Amino acid sequence: MLERLKAITNLLKGALEQRSRAEEGYIREEKVKEAIELLEALERDIMEKELKLAKEALEKFDSNRKFYYLVGKLYVEVSKEEAQKLIEDELKMFGGEGK
């Protein structure tokens, strides 16, 4: 993840360092597009990491506890099994593995 942040920083610095006015707009637009792609990939990486951590934490709790899952802006009470399935489904959405 740190490598992606460094790449974004360097990309944006490079876009600002362009000298030619004719090329400046086009080059900056391309650099911004590249930066957006890197940021989106970083966002997926972070989300996948958070989901994996949640999955690991969930496995440490017994089924007698109450579990809550954030759905939109609501926390919904779910069973341990439901929480595990929801996390696995989200991991698949972000390109991670469910198990």
From Swiss-Prot:
Which branch of life, at top level? Bacteria
The UniProt GO MF terms for this protein read: unfolded protein binding
Which keywords does UniProt give here?
Coiled coil
Query: SUPFAM superfamilies this protein is in?
Result: Prefoldin (SSF46579)
InterPro entries registered for this protein in UniProt:
PFD_beta-like, Prefoldin
Q: Which Pfam families match?
A: Prefoldin_2
Regions annotated as coiled coil: 3-68
What do the Gene Ontology cellular component annotations say? prefoldin complex
Per the record, the GO terms for biological process are: protein folding
Indicate yes or no for the key word Coiled coil: yes
Protein name (record): Uncharacterized protein aq_754
